[in-house]
Amino acid sequence: FDVNDEVASPYGYRIVTNYCISGRREDDKGVERQMTALEIMRPLLETDRKTDLTPQDIFSLLSRSYKNSFTGLDYVRDYRKLVSKKTGIAVDQDFIPRRSTSCSVVFHGVRPGSNPLSTVMWTVLGYPACAAAFPLMVGETDILPDYVKPDAAGHSQLCDIAMDLKSENVFKWNVSNGSHYMDMESV
């Protein structure tokens, strides 16, 4: 995707959730999540506010959002009204971060005329609500910190920590349909 292509990206940005706009239409997935992302970002990106947005803002607004535009629910905004009064438990359905989410990426591009190799790829490795963002220079090679590199089992230490936090604190019920519920008190 090219954000400089005015036909593909008329506003100079591109918001994509996996499987929402590629492949066969009958296989579309993530459409609700993309609707939410566009609803959150469009007002910001179509004003002067877009120049103030940082990758961290985008992670907070999108990757860590518990809003569902399809249903109108926003667990962050309306937490006290929406979750179970006794337990803080909420049903996980069509939020941008899914139970299976293991990474979120924001590319921080450069201004026209600047070296494109100065682009920074900000990465949240692991479940976004339980993980930290770190920068990687696109134009560099062999720069991955050891805690990001895969170990002998193919796992990143940083990702494993975030995924452990997710299973211990957010999706902590593994019986019956328990995996479809999240503990919003921990989020």
Feature names for model-found ranges:
Residues F1-V187:
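C-terminus-biased signal that marks the final domain/tail of proteins
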